């Protein structure tokens, strides 16, 4: 696939799956061996993460600031905005605005996303006031 094709796949992934939460399109852009470095292995972990986040921030919007591709790799710089109005199990919504700036690395194979490695400031869980336990596997 060309760099432009890869960029378009990532753009589609952000707008249709992450922003709109249309998980029915997930397998159209993610390979069976997809891994998300934040949520865990496989599309199932992304599905669950997206379900929670789209419920918590129903008006979520991604503004792509820049999109750079080199070979099979695409890097996106974005701003995520919205309002924390929906329930997250065990936490009450604050009604506060959400503003997150992030950079995400994507790697594609044969036009499908195989690796998704997001980094954001502040972290999405921090914005929602959710404390996560850190577990170290030995």
Q: Across the structure, where does each feature detected by a protein language model lie?
A:
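C-terminal and inter-domain tail/linker signature
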Residues: 1-138
């Amino acid at each position: 696939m060309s760099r432009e094709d890869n960029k378009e796949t990532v753009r589609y992934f952000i707008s249709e799956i992450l922003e709109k939460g249309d998980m029915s399109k997930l397998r159209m852009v993610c390979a069976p061996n997809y891994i998300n470095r934040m949520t865990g292995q496989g599309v199932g972990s992304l599905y669950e993460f997206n379900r929670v986040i789209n419920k918590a921030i129903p008006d979520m919007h991604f503004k792509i600031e820049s999109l750079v591709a080199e070979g099979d790799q695409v890097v996106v710089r974005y701003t995520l905005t919205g309002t924390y109005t929906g329930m997250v199990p065990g936490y009450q919504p604050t009604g506060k605005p959400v503003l997150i700036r992030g950079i995400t690395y994507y790697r594609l194979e044969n036009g499908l996303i195989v690796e998704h490695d997001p980094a954001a400031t502040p972290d999405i869980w921090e914005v929602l006031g959710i404390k996560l336990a850190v577990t170290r596997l030995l």
